[in-house]
Amino acid sequence: MSGRGKQGGKARAKAKSRSSRAGLQFPVGRVHRLLRKGNYAERVGAGAPVYMAAVLEYLTAEILELAGNAARDNKKTRIIPRHLQLAIRNDEELNKLLGKVTIAQGGVLPNIQAVLLPKKTESHHKAKGK
């Protein structure tokens, strides 16, 4: 025979996504497509979408971890925008990164100036001492 057909060839391996190869949850293929369609550069390397997906996944995990802690502190089981706001604004680095970002329904950080707080009276202690 002249080598036609697949008599003894190995079966093709099952397709494996680039996300699973990189050990990521975020979609590497989608990030690659968005980088190409976004006109950021004429060409996009193979490693760029993997790296970017990993960075996005890390930042998301970090924010969700802190927001989950904020929800637990408020005795809630569901993360709401308020918890995201508290998580981001209480973390120095995330606050710097997302400083110009407005979170809808996030509210503000509770902050009362020390000058406005009621003064502690010392006269009560002096009266007992006499």
Swiss-Prot record:
Keywords: Acetylation, Chromosome, Citrullination, DNA-binding, Hydroxylation, Isopeptide bond, Methylation, Nucleosome core, Nucleus, Phosphoprotein, Ubl conjugation
Domain of life, per lineage: Eukaryota
Record PTM Phosphothreonine, positions in chain: T121
PTM sites of type N5-methylglutamine: Q105
PTM (free text): Deiminated on Arg-4 in granulocytes upon calcium entry.
One BP annotation, GO: heterochromatin formation
Residue list for modification N6-(beta-hydroxybutyryl)lysine: K10, K14, K37, K96, K119
Positions of post-translational N-acetylserine modification: S2
Compositional bias ranges of the Basic residues kind: 7-19
Similarity remark: Belongs to the histone H2A family.
Protein name: Histone H2A type 2-A
Organism encoding this protein: Homo sapiens (Human)
